[in-house]
Amino acid sequence: YRRQRQMCIRDSLKTTFLPQGVFPELPRLGLAFCLAPAYNTFTWYGRGPQDNYPDRKTSAATGLWKGTVAEQYVHYPRPQDSGNKEEVQFLTLTDKQNKGIRVDAVEDVFSASALHYTAQDLYKETHDCNLKPRPEIILSMDAAVLGLGNSSCGPGVLKKYAIEKKEHTLHIRISKQ
């Protein structure tokens, strides 16, 4: 959904992902929006404050958390996905006047991240020092996210933390903050 002047989704946005056929292991199933640079304050009710994933979330307490979008990215030597928040009930991205957008879970919690990078930005660079943040904000909201596994060496993601090849639904309500 893209609107130039004013965004208004009166009821809710419901997207269902139904995998068919053979496909590779996916990192996430969801939607991504590009938002104006002014909406730089990220607040969420869910797991935090550190980034967390399906297989690494027990150390992240459920609560109301707040930070800048830049603070959500974790500088690993090799750029990779980071900043994910699990079990999000609602989030806001706001400017200095506390105006912006709010996203609420409708049926079930969702995963989310707000970064100054797209997935393509992260995966095309081999060193963190070469990464250039975008001024705009990339808001990802997901029905399912792949666990991290052992990332660097050894076994990958355990089967129970992989994205199951079944129907996944993201049901959210987007409104003005």
Model-predicted regions and their roles:
Residues 3-6, 10-177:
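Beta-strand/loop-rich accessory regions of lumenal/periplasmic or secreted enzymes
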